[in-house]
Amino acid sequence: MHHLNIAFIIPSLKANGPCIVCRDLVVQMIAHGHHCIVYYFDECGNLVFPCETVRITMKTMIDFEQFDIVHSHEVRPNLYVLLHKPLKCHTKFVVTIHNYVWRDYRSTYGVLKGGVGTLIFLLSILRHDKKVCLSKDMMAYYSHILNSKRLAYVYNTRNVDFKLGVTKEDEQSILGFKKDNYLIGTFCRILKRKNLCLVFRALSLLPHYRFLVIGDGPDLELVKMQCRECQVEDRVLFLGARKEAYRYLPLMDIFAIPSQSEGFPLALLEAAAFGTKCVCSDIDIFKECFNDNEIVTFPLAHPEQLACKIVEAQSREELKTNIKEKFNDSYSPQAFYDDYIAIYSDLLKE
């Protein structure tokens, strides 16, 4: 197909999940010869895009007619499209939905604020021509409230740089903490729904394991308190936030994701790309994307079973090869590009 002009709209240049997904897509589009520009609202973060980036406000007028595709991520960019999309326009508008809105908003903000936030989100994507979910499960979730003909799904990818290493200081700190034990690791934005307390409870049953937590977030102090309550604080290392946290995967024996809810965890894809053994909660998104030969899953709220599954994963060397092969076959940057360009192409034929 001919080369496209594509505008992406994101909240900021912060290195959070939706903006990283957008960056990964821009990288692939440019690599395949398409022209991209990224519009953003907030002057914060230092995510680098391989194209022009332009700061805007809700009052800024973008000439949408110059683009084939306008692709937004998150509520404010979606609202911008809702307000500024012309009544008649050849340009096609795409939104990527990054979460299970009511489930996640209710967990984060409570019933009242979560309900209002859900209504605002659903309103914000009203005028988009195609709404892209992150999985089949998410598409089924939204098919009850949105026009299923306007829904699609594309699995995320990750562009990882295997040459990046960690600082000598961090490496020495982690190895000194690990000693002769096995190291469980995770990296994430630290929220209550990430369910890290379950690993703390399992750790009390695993004397030869240590737990490395990389990241920051609004619930960090709560999570540290849970760690102390489980009396395992001497076996948990809170390293803090680190850029490109996947650099630390080679130091981990097992990567753990005990989340209660996930859209499509980029961290799991990074672990898969590195061929790291993964132990995950048995939520639908994980079971859809990886099978029992690629990851080990455990039921939520059962620390005893989590402890058993960690020991099982440690003994299964084939998990490393299997999960890496699955990433290369199904979640590679090329597969990500192919799926999105197919959606763009179909829209432009309408």
PLM region spans:
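Aromatic "clamp/platform" in nucleotide-sugar-dependent glycosyltransferases that forms part
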Residues: 241, 260
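Short His-centered aromatic/hydrophobic patch
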Residues: 72-78, 97-100
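A conserved mid-protein helix/loop that constitutes part of the nucleotide-sugar donor-binding site
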Residues: 19-27, 182-205, 218-224
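A charged, aromatic-enriched C-terminal amphipathic alpha-helix characteristic of glycosyltransferases
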Residues: 17, 315-348
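A short helix/loop element that forms part of the nucleotide-sugar donor recognition site in Leloir-type
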Residues: 163-178, 320
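Conserved acidic donor-binding segment of nucleotide-sugar-dependent glycosyltransferases
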Residues: 292-303, 312-317
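Short hydrophobic beta-strand element within catalytic cores of glycosyltransferases
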Residues: 277-280, 287
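Donor nucleotide-sugar binding/catalytic pocket of nucleotide-sugar-dependent glycosyltransferases
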Residues: 126-165
